């Protein structure tokens, strides 16, 4: 029918957790870090889900290090309560096409890690927020966090 043809010819913008195609690459790269932390929070809050979904938002070193961390928490019967707040600070292109370094302030002041009895396992003196640099890469229309060296700096 003609209505089908007109629907397929209408340009549409895909909206996802990693921004929209019309956003600048910098905005999309920053959104990838936000999406990564949202997924990590979800998996840490419900360890029964396993860590498979982390590969929807992360690859390479970042996937490995966070998968290990989540599995270690789950193995001890720990889970996360509360959500991480992520405030992107900057996105800078590297010399590799489609790759950015995103600096973001990660606020964990509302996050607790508890054991099976509900007792907090957060070390005393944990900073409420720290800035981290993430390497993010674009693959087609999707963005992935590929490197997190876990080097905390003040926000």
Task: List each model region and its residues.
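Surface-exposed, charged secondary-structure patches
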Residues: 76-116
């Amino acid at each position: 029918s003609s209505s089908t043809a007109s629907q397929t010819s209408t340009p549409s913008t895909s909206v996802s957790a990693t921004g929209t195609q019309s956003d600048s690459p910098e905005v999309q790269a920053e959104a990838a870090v936000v999406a990564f932390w949202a997924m990590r929070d979800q998996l840490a809050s419900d360890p029964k889900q396993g860590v498979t979904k982390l590969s929807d938002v992360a690859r390479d070193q970042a996937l490995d290090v966070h998968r290990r961390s989540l599995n270690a928490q789950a193995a001890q019967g720990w889970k996360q309560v509360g959500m991480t707040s992520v405030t992107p600070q900057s996105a800078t292109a590297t010399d590799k096409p489609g790759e950015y370094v995103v600096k973001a302030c990660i606020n964990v002041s509302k996050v607790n890690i508890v054991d099976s009895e509900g007792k907090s396992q957060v070390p005393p003196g944990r900073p409420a927020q720290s800035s981290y640099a993430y390497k993010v890469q674009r693959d087609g229309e999707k963005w992935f966090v590929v490197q997190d060296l876990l080097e905390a700096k003040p926000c």
